[in-house]
Amino acid sequence: MSVTKEQVIEFISNMTVLELSQFIKELEEKFGVSAAAPAVGMMMAAPTAASAEAEAEEKTEFDVILKEAGANKIAVIKVVRALTGLGLKEAKDKVDGAPSTLKEGVSKEDAEEAKKQLTEAGATVEVK
């Protein structure tokens, strides 16, 4: 009985990270190859605008930065409290100390939602 490619893929997809790491090491030893990318090619390639755009697209963690509170500071403080779970004094200190980072390492959806809420309250916000 021969094993199909689909069965191999299914088997590998059910492996844990540790098992997969050991599996890769065994394959490297058996075939005398390395799964690591060659460093020479990376050093020769100069960064271009296209690669910078691709890197920006691949980014998965974003920071929400309050640039300034705007005219309606009270509404912005309320939104900051709701987004961060901070107390009134801490939220006010964040708003008064702008520019300040409100959220770090959040998903793009969460960052955009926070930006939307803060902008609606009158704040100037940046997502990095």
From Swiss-Prot:
An example molecular function term from Gene Ontology annotations: structural constituent of ribosome
GO biological process, one term: translation
InterPro entries tied to this protein: Ribosomal_bL12, Ribosomal_bL12_C, Ribosomal_bL12_C/ClpS-like, Ribosomal_bL12_oligo, Ribosomal_bL12_oligo_N_sf
CC terms in the record's Gene Ontology section: cytosolic large ribosomal subunit
Keywords (A to Z) from UniProt: Ribonucleoprotein, Ribosomal protein
Cited Pfam families: Ribosomal_L12, Ribosomal_L12_N
Comp. bias regions, Basic and acidic residues: 105-118
Keyword Ribosomal protein listed: yes
Region (Disordered): 97-128
Transcription as UniProt keyword: no
Function: Forms part of the ribosomal stalk which helps the ribosome interact with GTP-bound translation factors. Is thus essential for accurate translation.
PANTHER family in UniProt: 39S RIBOSOMAL PROTEIN L12 (PTHR45987), LARGE RIBOSOMAL SUBUNIT PROTEIN BL12M (PTHR45987:SF4)
Subunit structure as annotated in this protein's UniProt entry: Homodimer. Part of the ribosomal stalk of the 50S ribosomal subunit. Forms a multimeric L10(L12)X complex, where L10 forms an elongated spine to which 2 to 4 L12 dimers bind in a sequential fashion. Binds GTP-bound translation factors.
Family: Belongs to the bacterial ribosomal protein bL12 family.
Protein known as: Large ribosomal subunit protein bL12
